[in-house]
Amino acid sequence: SLFKQHDKDVEPTFIKSGDGLTIERAGSDESRHYQLLGHTVGGSLNVEPCLITITSRDYEFPEFQHKGVEFIYMLKGQMDYYYGTKIYHFKKGDSLYFDSDKPHGPKKIISDECQFLTIICTNNSD
């Protein structure tokens, strides 16, 4: 498989709806909820899928900037998301794939609630 060179005999991770591990991240609070849906243990490739739910339009967002690549897929609601100097208007079904070394993050929440999946991939040797 594509990732076989990175990891050996890794068991699949199955997470039932609502059972993801709640984690704290920069900007976590009662209006921003992170659920880790799996991760890679060992090897040179680190993959971290996370379900993010934001329930406040007034939320102050931190700026994110880190090594690796990131993929975002909008599941519910609407938001403006910035990457460098560009702003992308997300609606359900929209996605963005980018090199996460530039400043990025939600700029404005447009709906009462928005939910999106983010997958961050980094190289453990960096």
Locations of regions flagged by a protein language model:
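Short beta-strand His + acidic residue motifs that chelate non-heme Fe in jelly-roll/DSBH
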Residues: 62, 81-82, 88-89, 104-111
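Short, conserved beta-strand element in jelly-roll/cupin
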Residues: 51-56, 66-81
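His/acidic/aromatic-lined binding-pocket segments of jelly-roll/cupin-type domains
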Residues: 62-65, 69-74, 88, 96
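Short C-terminal boundary/hinge segments that cap the last helix of small helical domains
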Residues: 1-14
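A short glycine-rich, His/Asp/Glu-containing loop-to-beta-strand
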Residues: 23-62, 119-124
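Short acidic-glycine-tyrosine-enriched beta hairpin
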Residues: 84-100
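C-terminal, beta-strand-rich globular interaction domains
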Residues: 99-100, 112-124
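Long amphipathic N-terminal alpha/beta scaffold segment
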Residues: 8-11, 21-26
